[in-house]
Amino acid sequence: MVAAIVILLSPLVYWLTGIGQSASQLSADITYAPDGTLVSSPKAVALHDLWLPMGIERLLIYPLVLIGFQLSGESLALRRWVERLAQGQPLRGVQGQPRLARRNLGRLLGHMGRLIPRAWRGRVTGQDLAVALLFIVMLEVATSLLYLPFSFYGSFIVARQFGYSTQTAPAWLWDWIKNLSITLVADGVIWTGFYALLRLMPRRWPIPAGGALIGLSAVVILITPILITPLFYKIHPLQDAALRARILALADRAGLHVSQMYVVDESSKSTLVNAYFTGFGNSRRIVLYDTLLTGYTPDEVEVVLAHEMGHWYYRHMLLGWLGAGAAGWIGLFGLRWLLNRSWARLGLRGPADVAGLPYILAVISFVAILALPVENSLSRYAERQADHFSLAVSHKPAAFIQLFQKFAVQNLSVVDVPEWEEIVFDTHPPIVDRIRMAETFREQEQK
């Protein structure tokens, strides 16, 4: 309860600090100190001072909300409510609901029952699946609505105050609804399948669950550029023939095959700049923000793309997918051990009781927090590899330096952070380190 109140009130607290309200008066220009050290812009520092506590709060409060929901008995109450709903029993305060529930939920149970192979129907029923699905959807909707004020403040109001958002409030809300819908479908499939496996294979479920985890993550990587991204952006093939020729020449020097190049209309949402490689196999493609094409020189764009090609060359996406899959698979065995020893204390009917989902999500969140230093260290290593590849292939250290100076201004990025913050939170090396790498590369080339 306390954690939920913190989530609801924290946007007001951040607003009362006045940081966002004064952002328009701050300069976004970086400067150099007398000793030659690059200094972050006042606006970037203000944004960082706002985002850091918000990020820490989001990390820590979310699992506490879930634990509170579990230990208070509310999770058990929600499961009982969902069971009554699935059985078409009367719900308090809902007039005329039983007949409607029997008709519509009866159809749902029938459809879900037909999804179960006959050999499995003695261990898992259509009602089991329906209860799990309804519980998951309601929990996801409840937590999303709880975080809606926080999300709206952080990703819309703050973005407008600091001048990098180009969205209207209705457009932001529509994106939020689409994102929630995708999450409901994905979580519904994943967690309903998870609880079905717990019923079918009480002892061996981590083995098929791990395989499914790796397979589903591969499917997500494959379909995201084709099905998900177009829901949020207008996408069109790169039309600039001269830039296409430069990209193809760059890829040829890097020993890579590139055929699909696309541009997304990031300018419809923000002024932020980026480019990335995505997908596997035939879905693999280069994606450029239109903000990159309109505000940067061809040499700077080439440096960005060379960096992204470095990720491709070193197979960072593939290695990340395999590493995350292996870690997740091992984690499933740890989760089995934990569930077998804690379900009775939580008042659950067994490990396969969907009422234990908040507990599972909280455990996953805490483990993810503990893993941040290792995960982000590997990410920074990969980014340094890609930076070095970019310099080695493009041979444009001056453009590299100019690029990151512009990034610091346009993306309102601080150029350096305390070491503890870099270790725990940063997925990329500080901008000063990346510029220093380019300066060292230029000095070595001039020798």
Predicted regions: what is each one?
Residues 2-4, 11-93, 100, 104-352, ...:
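Polar-ligand-bearing catalytic/cofactor-coordination segments
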Residues 352-360:
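N-terminal signal-anchor/signal peptide hydrophobic helix marking the start
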